[in-house]
Amino acid sequence: MQTLSQSIVQYLEMCEYERNLSADTLKAYRIDLRQFLEFTKGEWADRDMLNRYIKHLNVCFSPRSVKRKLASVRAFYHELEYNGILEENPFHKLHIRIQSPKQLPRTI
């Protein structure tokens, strides 16, 4: 089985060449997945680790950033499962609720 780091590199290459994502999207994915890799210390995540990661993100980032970072990691794990690299996606049946504070409209 590949390492988490190798899988991330392959996923980012696939995003760049096959999915033809924009440079800004790729940059965000790279940052998000690098931070995830650092948090996991290169280990494959299970549900418990994902819950700890979510708690870590909630402390360090705004709700909007947390949602984007989780979307990046979730898409990565979905692709791994789709390609048969993982048997089970740890995001399955993991209910994540991140409340964004409601913003009032700005006055003109």
Where are these regions (language model features)?
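Basic nucleic-acid-binding interfaces
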Residues: 107
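A detector for short, charged/polar N-terminal pre-domain segments
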Residues: 1-5
